[in-house]
């Protein structure tokens, strides 16, 4: 019975993953961002209520990274060309400091990793201010929905299989 349930759950997740690829293609969004949101749904042991807080944490991180990018760009215009690496390190120091300081906010500590990952997501995706919504927000929502769907359908399937 254990192997049968595991196989059926695995097939279910495979089916959802294939559907995510199709939806990503149809909507012309980056599938890796969708999978990023989906994986983080599980990493943060989310439910629907927590998932919106996680999404907010992603966007706090994205916003901080956006401000950091503008600061790096500005400081590089006034600093000598030889100091670009040091300017970037200086700004990243402040970004990391701010992110960890967010732990003092009650009920936010568990979402600091999502905030960190939001900064990573921004820097890795190469999006601009104008493309954050279609290139990050929409795919993250799809990923969170895939995570919710996985847990919901897995729970229902487990109940059905164990009858």
Could you describe each region identified by the protein language model?
Residues 85-90, 131-143:
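Loop-to-transmembrane alpha-helix initiation sites
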Residues 24, 75-82, 101-108, 129-134:
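Membrane-interface helix caps and helix-loop-helix hairpins in membrane proteins
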Residues 82, 137-163:
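Alpha-helical transmembrane segments and their cytosolic interface
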Residues 28-45, 93-99, 103-128:
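Pore- and pathway-forming membrane helices of multi-pass small-molecule/ion transporters and channels
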Residues 16-24, 64-76, 95-103, 121-125, ...:
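Alpha-helical membrane-inserting segments
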Residues 33-73:
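Alpha-helical membrane segments and adjacent membrane-interface helices in multi-pass membrane proteins
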Residues 20-35, 78-93:
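Structural signature of hydrophobic alpha-helical transmembrane segments
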Residues 1-11:
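N-terminal membrane topogenic signal
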């Amino acid at each position: 019975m254990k192997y049968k349930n595991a196989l059926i759950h695995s097939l279910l997740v495979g089916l959802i993953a294939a559907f995510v690829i199709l939806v990503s293609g149809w909507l012309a969004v980056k599938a890796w961002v969708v999978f990023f949101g989906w994986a983080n749904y599980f990493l943060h042991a989310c439910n629907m209520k927590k998932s919106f807080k996680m999404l907010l944490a992603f966007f706090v991180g994205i916003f901080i990274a956006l401000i950091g990018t503008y600061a790096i760009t500005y400081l590089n215009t006034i600093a000598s060309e030889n100091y670009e690496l040091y300017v970037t390190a200086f700004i990243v120091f402040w970004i990391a400091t701010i992110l960890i300081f967010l732990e003092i906010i009650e009920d936010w500590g568990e979402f600091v990793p999502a905030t960190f990952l939001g900064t990573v997501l921004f820097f890795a995706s190469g999006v601009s201010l104008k493309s954050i919504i279609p290139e990050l927000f929409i795919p993250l929502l799809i990923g969170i929905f895939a995570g919710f769907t996985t847990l919901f359908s897995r729970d229902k399937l487990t109940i059905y299989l164990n009858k």
